[in-house]
Regions:
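Short beta-strand His + acidic residue motifs that chelate non-heme Fe in jelly-roll/DSBH
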Residues: 100, 108-113
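Non-catalytic, conserved peripheral segments adjacent to functional cores
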Residues: 1-96, 113-147
Length: 147
């Protein structure tokens, strides 16, 4: 199993069954992992497609997968970190319904797993600002996506 990256928070979320439609909790401002609200957005990814690598210098990500299944991979290249040079991966879905909080300064990429729609919600700590993030091509950080 991958080692949990320093600063990552994994929070189990409530799902409430209701005969007219289920309720999926996301985040409260009193939750661990809430570092302010900048914006919330949804993003979809097709099966076996991969988006990333991206590193934020100001934005904390809070990722939830209410539809489909997505594998998230985090890589820590922070020299001062106890988890320097480690990877952490997790698949989130309705069956593994959790919020993944990703701190600033680590690399993140994700892959669509389900045949149907794979959708994530990011509850971001700041509004989108393209100058606070760095990107790399997938082959610049070596990770075995085929497991």
């Amino acid at each position: 199993m991958d080692k949990m990256i320093e600063g990552i928070i994994l929070t189990p979320l409530k799902q409430i069954n209701h005969p007219k439609g289920d309720i999926y909790h996301g985040m409260k401002k009193s939750d661990n992992g809430f570092f302010g609200f900048g914006e919330a957005y949804f993003s979809t990814i097709s099966k076996n497609e991969i988006k990333g690598w991206k590193k934020h210098t100001e934005m904390v990500l809070n990722l939830i997968v209410p539809v489909g299944e997505i594998e998230f991979v985090i890589y820590d290249d922070r020299l001062e970190s106890a988890t320097f040079n480690n990877f952490f991966s997790i698949k989130l879905s309705q069956n593994n319904y959790k919020r993944l909080t990703i701190p600033i300064g680590v690399w993140m990429a994700f892959k669509g797993i389900s045949e149907e729609t794979n959708m994530l919600l990011n509850i971001a700590s700041i509004e989108h600002n393209p100058v606070e993030a760095f990107t790399k091509e997938l082959d610049e950080i070596k990770y075995n996506w085929i497991k």
